[in-house]
């Protein structure tokens, strides 16, 4: 959009191509309906119960990390009913806007990224959790997200692959306008379209420091070269706070490690085509052509991206419980990436205290 309006735009990326970090193998959902923040009144007690489980949906590895403790204190302050409702409103508003912009973009730019516009089903296996979700869904409907409760039979009618798991389910919520797709393929194609519009990409350019004076950013040092511009946007995901801290900016963004498994599907495999969210396990399922992406959980363990076998197998195990007729066509590919999480789950978008520096981070 900037290039179209006549701006000269440059992108610095430390990777050799676009979409190789946070976007590489994530859950692949465009989920306005997934707007309830992690910080809500139920989470503190749940997190305590999960602490001893290596496969828990939300895992905090307590360590000598001042940034993590500061983040956790802020997180607890966001767990009140009043703050939760305010955060839901902001997240839904931004998500609705983002989905509209994506749909408008697809109407004018050819994009193929295994996208499906079949909605998202939130699955529940506990009646108390289902009742709590119904209250949250009612709040989201107030703000424009049409998330409606369904019976088990209605859920299976929308996604027949759930039929073998009927006895596990107590109900679901469904948002028909939500979508799914391959974020990596989307990012790669968008990079090509941007390059065709005149955007210059500098790959393999690791930003080492920022030069600032007089309340303004004067340049970005990357790969031994100083890049200068009129306006800068910091969009480095979980690494944004590390880069901006020397400038006196302390952003409440901390890396939340998420896991995914990508399963190649045999021709006779019974797998979902509607994107799903398993609320109890904090796992999502997205159909990407002849692949099934299983992703989720959050592990707070600094910037570590090493795979934990227990957490990887928990994804596969849950998929087998829900879809016993799932037949892989080969080995699953496991991946872990860092989601830039704020305590409220509301991202940081817009101006910073530095006059010509904007933020676009915290979307975890």
Question: What positions do the PLM features span?
Answer:
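Glycine-rich FAD pyrophosphate-binding loop
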Residues: 3-24
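Hydrophobic anchor at the start of a short beta-strand
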Residues: 9, 147, 232
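Central helical "cap/lid" subdomain
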Residues: 18-21, 212, 218-272, 308
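Glycine-rich active-site loop/strand segments that organize a redox cofactor
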Residues: 25-93, 113
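Rossmann-like flavin
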Residues: 69-192
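C-terminal catalytic lobe of FAD-dependent flavoproteins
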Residues: 147, 279-280, 304, 320-364
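A conserved short coil-to-beta-strand element within the FAD-binding core of flavoproteins
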Residues: 150-159, 179, 200-218
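Flavin-binding catalytic cores
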Residues: 243-246, 250, 266-269, 289-293, ...
